[in-house]
């Protein structure tokens, strides 16, 4: 396998949503840095394809699929897979999530509850399951937030998504406080407009794409690999004095 600085050598990293663009890119990036990766996804085929990609590149990875992270039992089973296979958990990257978009007057009670379960509850359940083992390893948690937690866009009916991701940033700050005595660092990442499976259909609308790119200083979409690079920084000792914060990866959208 082509390696970089081996910044995660000997580390066991649990990454959720490895069937997606960012999850797959992160699994490969972490493996190239020496990590043993434990992935999961609701999509059996996509998750299996990522395992095959990582192993073909010479990396070490196992995966649980399908895995419903809104089910506490599945979260416990995922952590047990990591412990059974590699004996420890050093890094938890809560990347997975499903978004539902609708305006206030159109969103249903069921959609609101479903959005919360698939953006907030799953982070709580899995972090709770991993916490005793992260205490033992003085580990790291990285949570996936969103630029929507701090910005609103007139073209995007993101009430539930905005609310949930703001909650993730708050949860991150609280977890960092609770983890401080155990050497656990907790941070989050807020991506802007990243080309991924989740955004590709939105980008097919020229008006929407033009409006969003027009608010980006760098004038282009972000790449999944660019988010993975930030996740690597937060997961590694390179960020040993960083905790309780949110890092924005948005090409300058927030400041313009």
Predicted feature locations:
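Conserved glycine-rich cofactor-binding loop
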Residues: 12, 19-21
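Conserved mid-core segment of classical short-chain dehydrogenase/reductases
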Residues: 76, 98-113, 154-160, 200-204
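Catalytic Tyr-X3-Lys loop
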Residues: 90, 98, 105-125, 142, ...
